[in-house]
Amino acid sequence: MLDPKVIVALDYPNQDAALAFVDRIEPGSCRLKVGKEMFTLYGPDFVRKLHECGHSVFLDLKFHDIPNTCSRAVAAAAELGVWMVNVHASGGERMMAASRDILEPYGKDRPLLIAVTVLTSMEASDLAGIGIACAPQEQVLNLATLTKNSGLDGVVCSAQESTMLKSALGKEFQLITPGIRPVGSAAGDQRRVMTPVEAVSAGSDYLVIGRPITQATDPSAVLAEINQSLA
């Protein structure tokens, strides 16, 4: 696939298990997401190993800091050669704009830069607990609009917000959606979930899927089935 929609979340207890999984799937069938746990344990060398296997990597570290510090972290991700990197939209416009600007020298080789809006585990009561009075959907739109105005490529959002965001922010604004569960999968700790077909129909551009693929007896077959459903 030239532009696979599935991003597999590599949430493994150790590097060997992750690399064993990677050996079982075709690089062109998906992209891989490396999050905080695995990056903290195994660092940039782990990402380099994934690149050596032919895979594109979404570095999901959700940078959130003062503009100078955040932008330098984003530049470090670009130097590592990742396909996508993210920041927290709640860091504000100056932080996001600085992160965007620092990628300009990379031209067409720069990673996609996206922002996290409202974590998919959060409900209205969770937002209220941190002093945000609006509903999750309203806060997602607020932060996604700020992200677009800051010049970023897109946002992480739940599939339930995808149609709203595509309508409000345009088709070119990329939507990356976690909380995706193929039919028959458990919801786990995600609160706002959809199937792959539902999510793409709603407007999501890329789908983050973890355990339904990584814990499958035949992950390549599960991935192929998902890709076929989206063809």
From Swiss-Prot:
PROSITE patterns: OMPDECASE. The keyword tRNA processing does not apply. Its EC number is 4.1.1.23. One of its GO terms (molecular function) is orotidine-5'-phosphate decarboxylase activity. Pfam families: OMPdecase. SUPFAM superfamilies: Ribulose-phoshate binding barrel. InterPro entries: Aldolase_TIM, OMPdecase, OMPdecase_AS, OMPdecase_bac, OMPdeCOase_dom, RibuloseP-bd_barrel. Keywords: Decarboxylase, Lyase, Pyrimidine biosynthesis. Catalyzes the decarboxylation of orotidine 5'-monophosphate (OMP) to uridine 5'-monophosphate (UMP). Homodimer. Belongs to the OMP decarboxylase family. Type 1 subfamily. This is Orotidine 5'-phosphate decarboxylase. It comes from Photobacterium profundum (strain SS9). The lineage of its organism: Bacteria, Pseudomonadati, Pseudomonadota, Gammaproteobacteria, Vibrionales. The gene is pyrF.
